[in-house]
Amino acid sequence: MSLQVCVMTPERIFWNGQSEEIILPTNTGEMGVLKNHAPIITGLDVGAMLIRTEKGWTSVAIMGGFGIVGQNRVILLVNEAESADTINAEQAESDFNSAKEKLEQAQSTKQRVEANTQFKRAKARYQVVKNLSKA
């Protein structure tokens, strides 16, 4: 293994271990991190994060935060995190479709902002469940 990865929420250490690669949802798009990555601090967006270990890929829904990369260590401070095994697949799909519909029907700026936030959260959870079914 080449990266030490720690994912922390305000309540607890969510995931801590060795990884070959991670893919993060940042505020400017997805970012992959491999061994010997250049030091960086980045904002994390709401989305699905992928962690590759020797056992395969793990998908985690994160709800924004910050990431610090340096010296083959990755520290992620996230608002919330959910793993695929804690998400009900049918509920995630239903929430995603409902949030998508709300976003399409939003009229005012306030409604669009609120609907977009709900949509991004629902999409992250749904992507995590879909990634699990592909594994």
From Swiss-Prot:
GO terms for molecular function: ATP binding; proton-transporting ATP synthase activity, rotational mechanism. It is a peripheral membrane protein. NCBIfam families: ATP_synt_epsi. It comes from Stigeoclonium helveticum. F-type ATPases have 2 components, CF(1) - the catalytic core - and CF(0) - the membrane proton channel. CF(1) has five subunits: alpha(3), beta(3), gamma(1), delta(1), epsilon(1). CF(0) has three main subunits: a, b and c. It is found in: Plastid, Chloroplast thylakoid membrane. Belongs to the ATPase epsilon chain family. PANTHER family: ATP SYNTHASE DELTA/EPSILON CHAIN, ATP SYNTHASE EPSILON CHAIN, CHLOROPLASTIC. Keywords: ATP synthesis, CF(1), Chloroplast, Hydrogen ion transport, Ion transport, Membrane, Plastid, Thylakoid, Transport. GO terms for cellular component: chloroplast thylakoid membrane; proton-transporting ATP synthase complex. This is ATP synthase epsilon chain, chloroplastic. Produces ATP from ADP in the presence of a proton gradient across the membrane. It comes from the Eukaryota.
